[in-house]
Every structure is written in C-alpha cells, then in structure tokens.
A protein has these predicted regions:
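Alpha-helical transmembrane segments and their helix-start/interface "positive-inside/aromatic belt" motifs
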Residues: 1-14, 46-50, 88-99
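Alpha-helical transmembrane segments of integral membrane proteins, especially early/N-terminal helices
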Residues: 6-27, 55-62
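Non-transmembrane, membrane-proximal soluble domains of secreted or membrane proteins
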Residues: 21-46, 68-293
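Alpha-helical transmembrane segments
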Residues: 42-59
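Hydrophobic alpha-helical transmembrane segments that serve as membrane anchors
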Residues: 55-67, 102-105
C-alpha cells in the first residue's frame, strides 16, 4: 500500500469521524426535552451509540460501494479469481475489533447504569441517579408518593397530606420516591421526557426514584399492552417549584372529594349508552375519588 493510498484512507476516516460526531450531536434533538437528571445520562449514552453506529454503518457501506464500483470484474472477464484461501492476520483483526467495540459499549452502558444506582429486578427497586444533580437541593427528598395502576387509570396518593389525584405533581430538583403497585395486570410506568420506565407487577410494591429538573407538564403513559383501552391510560405529570408544589398540596387538602378523570371509563360508558359496546372487554375501573385537582 503506497503513501497516496494511505493518505486517502486517513482523510476518509477523518471525514467519516467528523460526520459521525455530527450525527451524535444531532441525536440529542431527536429526543424529548431533558426533564429529569436521569435523562442527561441516557441521552449521552444514546448519542454515543449513534456516533459509533454511524461510523460503522457508513464505513461498511462505503467499503462495499467502492468494491462494487471499482473492484468488480470486467464485463467480458470470465477468468477465475485469485486462489485466496484465507488471511489469518485479517481474520484476527476483524474478530478483535467487534469484540473490543462490544466491550466498550457494555462498559459505558454499565457506567451509566451504575451512576443511576439501579439495584436490579431482584430487589424491584430503582434508586435513581444519586450523582446526577450535584446540588444541595438534590439531597432533599419528598415523602413517598403511592402510584396505583389499574385498567385503565392512574391514581396518585400523597399519604402524609391525605391527597389523591389523577395527575402526578412533583417538585423540581428534589428526589422523588414512588411506590408503584398494580391491582390487575402488568402496567408500564413510562415518562418519555424523564427517560424512566418501570414495569409494575401485580401483587408487588416497587420503589422507584428519580429527580425532576425542569418545570413543565409532561405525559405519563402505560408502556405495556394492558388491554383494550391501554392507549387511554395517560395522564399529566406536572413538575413545579417546591413552593408551588407545597401550595398545591395545601390547597388540595381543602378541596371536596369528587370523581377524577378516566378517559377509558368515559369512553366505555358512552358506548354502553349508545348500545355499541363492540367486542367483549373488561369493564374499565371507575374513576378514583380525588381531592387534588
């Protein structure tokens, strides 16, 4: 291989690296806003994987394209190819590189996993990312919020204040502790803007922690196919300042109790009234009685 060929390959590799790094930065814009401390780590990991994947993809496709266009046999060339039986050095290289890449990806992924301090499925506890927000405010934690899931409605209870709501209110920059339970089937607690997801198993209480860092209204979805109206099992997650959060709790304790919102139950009730029940399905759980609204 002469100097000219080596120079061209180096230039192409540098250009490919630049494009890959650019794609990795663009990957941040493909995701929702970063509304939790955990989202920063997850987005960095996603950007890393996009960068690496772009380099490999265009490197392989570029090599194949060059081979097809410039290394193919002539139109009327019917001669046999060179009798190459193998190349031990090349085979070692293309085996070693993927192994090292997989180890690199696994190591980085484990570092993210470890920094989030996730204990794993045996304990059914996600302790969240203890080091994600290096501030004194992050040391403060809220009392545990009970999250009850049933077909197809979310119910949130703040036991210390005796407040119940169908919307999840959270304070900004404070550790949030949730106690997740399911009354019927497996549900998925998933907030895309927070990059957190936890399956909720019937008959088990699962402790889950994270840190909201951005005020706003986000969507909580059931990420598991839990039945007919699972797509309607959505609600708002409202992140507000600690002062606004405390005011909301205080005002909620003074509100009279009333049935909360349940899109699944409302839709089913309308179908029953109109006589268009359709296929047989489980009757949605009635709206919970709430005072936080």
């Amino acid at each position: 291989m002469n100097i000219r060929t080596i120079s061209i390959l180096v230039i192409l590799a540098i250009a490919l690296a630049v494009v890959s790094l650019w794609m990795g930065q663009q990957a941040y814009t493909w995701l929702p806003v970063q509304a939790s401390a955990e989202s920063q780590l997850i987005d960095d990991l996603f950007s890393f994987l996009v960068t690496l994947g772009t380099f490999i993809f265009f490197g392989v496709v570029g090599t194949l394209t060059y081979s097809v266009l410039f290394q193919r046999a002539g139109k009327y060339d019917n001669s046999d190819g060179p009798p190459i039986e193998g190349n031990v050095k090349l085979e070692i290289i293309w085996t070693t590189i993927p192994i090292l890449l997989v180890i690199w990806i696994a190591g980085y992924s484990y570092q993210v996993y470890d920094r989030m301090s996730i204990l794993g499925p045996m304990e059914h506890v996600h302790r969240g990312m203890a080091m994600a927000v290096e501030s004194e405010s992050n040391k403060n934690t809220t009392p545990s919020i009970e999250v009850h899931s049933r077909q197809w409605v979310w119910e949130f209870r703040y036991p210390e204040q005796n407040v119940t709501s169908t919307e999840l209110h959270l304070p900004k920059d404070r550790r949030v502790k949730l106690a997740l339970t399911s009354d019927d089937v497996i549900h998925g607690f998933y907030i895309p803007a927070f990059r957190v997801k936890q399956d909720i198993i019937p008959g088990q209480k699962i402790d889950f922690e994270f840190t909201p860092i951005r005020e706003g209204t986000y969507r909580l979805r059931d990420s598991q196919y839990s039945g007919t109206y699972f797509s309607a099992m959505q609600t708002n997650v409202i992140v507000e300042s600690p002062e606004s959060y405390e005011n909301w709790l205080t005002n909620a304790t003074k509100q009279p109790s009333k049935p909360g919102d349940s899109p699944a139950f409302s839709e089913y009730s309308q179908l029953v009234k109109s006589g268009r029940v359709g296929w047989k399905t489980i009757v949605p759980a009635p709206p919970p009685i709430i005072n936080g609204y």
